[in-house]
Amino acid sequence: MGWNEAIKLRSASLPALCLLYVTCALDASGAASYAKEAVITETAGTVRIAADSPRPLEQVLNALQSKYGWIVNYEDPQYVSAVDVIKASSDSQVPSGGSFTFEFSSAAPDEGKTLRQLVDTYNKSKNPGHFELRHTADGGFNVVGTAGHSDKGEIVEQQAPFDLALTLSNKEQTIDETVTRICAEVSRQSRSNVVLAISPRKILFQNRVALGGNKVAARELLSKSLGATHGKIYWRLLFDPESKNYYLNLHLVHGV
């Protein structure tokens, strides 16, 4: 998929993206079926985070960010099996996540150890997808979906879209254009379109970056692009079982 096609798909996909977010909070009758955010409690030296979401692992990461300020990028695997998908309303499908509880010691928790424990605990649960915790060059962390169920109910390894090695000519563009170009190249090489959806548009349009590389991981190129904003931006790469598209949401951390 070329850059121009990526722009068109991005515009056409926004209504579907809005619908995706609305239906994630509804059941077939239109009543709320998931928690808006995870519930955090702390008793007897133990922190307990109770999530209830189509993507409970992401919801726990959001809770950890709220409590400790840990900024962690999150990437869905592909949810393509009936085992990993449920109907949230009469005409939409979402990942078949639900309740998930994570507990850890409240005594000066270490970010890396806690995140490792979280991912390991999640992978042992019955919720959809399997994930890996990845360290970044700047000391941060990515939680990356690496497997999902097949139609036979078996766990099957998947290639994460941002693991793809890209070759891009060095070109100075706005950061919005650069991220869109990265998404377009990932889409061209993979089986799913990757669309830049939610983002701090003003910052991405006002800042420019000269970026390219030969066989560089898409995730690294994305991280360098966002770093050129001189702000703290993290991402959520969400797979929509309905359209089979990935939606890249970028969020600005305020006050950092």
Feature-to-residue mapping (PLM):
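N-terminal targeting/assembly segments of extracytoplasmic apparatus and virion spike/baseplate proteins
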Residues: M1-V256
